[in-house]
Each structure stands twice: as C-alpha cells, then as structure tokens.
Design a protein with these regions (language model features):
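Structural microenvironment flanking redox-active thiols in thiol-disulfide oxidoreductases
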Residues: 67-105, 116-121
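Short active-site neighborhood of thiol/selenol oxidoreductases, capturing the structured segment around
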Residues: 45-67
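N-terminal "domain-start" segment that seeds a small globular fold
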Residues: 19-45
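Structural micro-motif
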Residues: 107-109, 127-137
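Bacterial N-terminal signal peptides
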Residues: 9-17
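Short loop/turn microsegments at loop-to-beta-strand junctions
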Residues: 29-30, 52, 133-135
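Thiol-/selenol-based redox modules, centered on thioredoxin-like
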Residues: 132-176
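Bacterial N-terminal signal peptides that target proteins for export
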Residues: 1-8
Length: 176
C-alpha cells in the first residue's frame, strides 16, 4: 500500500469515527467548568432547570471573523437579553487574551476560556488543527442540546441567535 493510500485510509477512518461522536439535538450537553472574562467561573450545572444557555464557539481572539461576531453580540446583545437565556462566546484562548479581546470589543457578556481544549473536544467543536470551529450550541433548561448551528454568519450572529431562540420556544425574560 502506498503512503498516499495509507493516509487516505487513516483520514477516512478518522472522519467516520468523528462523525459518530458528534453532538446532536436531544443529547445531554457535556458539563463544563470554565473561567470567564467577567471574573466568574461558570458550569452547565448552575443553569439546570433555571435557564437556557447559548455557547458561541469561535476559533481565535483578535481574528477578523471572531471580532465581527463579538461586535455583533456586543452591539445587538439587547436582542438576546430580552430572552430568558444566558449567552457566552467561548474559545481555547487564554483567559488573559479573552479579557483583552472582550475589552477591545466592548463585550458586555462573558467570554469563556478553555485553554485545555477538553470542553471544546467534548462539545465536538475542536478542529483537527487544535482550534474550535465557529459553531453555536443551544442548550435547554434541562441540559439537553436544542440545536447546533454549524453555519454561522459572524456579522448577524446576535440577530440569528435571537431568531433561533424564539424558534426554539425560549420565552422572553420576566421583568424583575
């Protein structure tokens, strides 16, 4: 067998094995404990039976698409804040880098840091080159995956998230 055939066989095997572990609608979302740019540590468990959450995974801070997505969420976050949901952006960047990125883009929502890449791998967003793919995961109050968006338009991220949350039946936030 030639080296090209061996490589092709390995790649096919890898793609088949990866496709069998993809996070799907109805799956229990993997728990996580991640530090955020607001100084807090968040877990999936803390939202159980309380609130839906959205995690918008992005490849790397300070890159063009990620900056556009972050600005969309910062500028149009009111659309999401009107709904009974907590939303995050998440990457495998260091907490310090994410803090700088959040400050530069005036993000008024937490950015999660997963430098170990374990949570990104559990959420099946980690690409073969070690960075997350731009995927957004919607999780219900029960901790189950409601939707995985693998086709993100960075410039309309906030609007698209709000529309999807409404489509998924996430209610508006109750006045306190």
């Amino acid at each position: 067998m030639t080296s090209n055939n061996v490589l092709l066989t390995l790649l096919i095997g890898l793609s088949i094995s990866l496709s069998t572990i993809a996070l799907e609608v109805g799956d229990q979302a993997p728990d996580f404990t991640l530090e955020a740019t607001d100084g807090k540590t968040y877990t999936l468990e803390q939202f159980h039976n309380k609130q839906a959450i959205v995690i918008a995974w992005y490849p790397r801070a300070f890159t063009s698409g990620c900056t556009i997505e972050c600005k969309s969420l910062a500028n149009n976050g009111h659309l999401l804040k009107a709904l009974d949901v907590t939303y995050f952006m998440a990457s495998v960047d260091s907490l310090e880098k994410n803090k700088e990125f959040a400050a530069e883009n005036e993000a008024d929502f937490p950015l999660l840091s997963d430098p170990s890449k374990k949570v990104a791998a559990a959420y099946d967003v980690l690409a073969f080159y070690g960075m997350p793919m731009r995927h957004t995961v919607y999780i219900g109050k029960d901790g189950k995956v409601l939707f995985v968006d693998r086709n993100i338009q960075a410039s309309t991220s906030a609007e698209d998230m709000a529309a999807k949350l409404k489509e998924l039946g996430i209610p508006t936030r109750q006045a306190s």
